Amino acid sequence: MADAFEQSPVLCATDLTKLYGTHVGCTGVSLEIYPGEVLGIVGESGSGKSTLLNMLSGRLRPTAGSVLYCDAHGMKRSLHDLSEGYRRRLLRTELGFVHQHPRDGLRMQVSAGANISERLMAAGVRRYADLRQSAVTWLKRVEIDPARVDDRPEQYSGGMQQRLQI
């Protein structure tokens, strides 16, 4: 039998709207995302995909509506009221976003291995050898040569940067 956390959405967006002056970025979006669920946002250019994803990730505060995160204890908290540090940890451990522009999702000034290891460190892994081995393993899984573990993302092609975000 699944526990209450698995039955509850991990992220709830209700009536999200973002206005840029008189221009509508997006309006009235509501959705729920459950643990283990993968969601893709598709649409025409200028339809509000990036605006929506930026609100869902906490990078952009909505003009109206809310984004609630349900933590492991079942407590719902406003994603936009969380500290930047907590939100960053959350996005590295429990929620994942593959950004249209990889520079929005990667730390370009540090190595690919460090980008991968950051999530593991947030989850409590501390041994350098374990972090490095995990980074090499993940690079192989997304079909990036593990010999490039020390290269910075800016040295990768756009497609490789997209895969590195995964």
Language-model-detected regions and their locations in the chain:
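The feature captures the beta-strand-to-loop junction immediately N-terminal to the Walker
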Residues: 42-44
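Helix-to-loop junction immediately C-terminal to a conserved catalytic motif
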Residues: 57
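Conserved ABC transporter NBD signature motif
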Residues: 65-78
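ABC ATPase NBD coupling module
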Residues: 75-96, 122
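Q-loop/switch helix immediately C-terminal to the Walker
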Residues: 101, 108-122
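Conserved ABC ATPase "signature" region
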Residues: 130-147
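Conserved ABC ATPase signature
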Residues: 152-156, 160
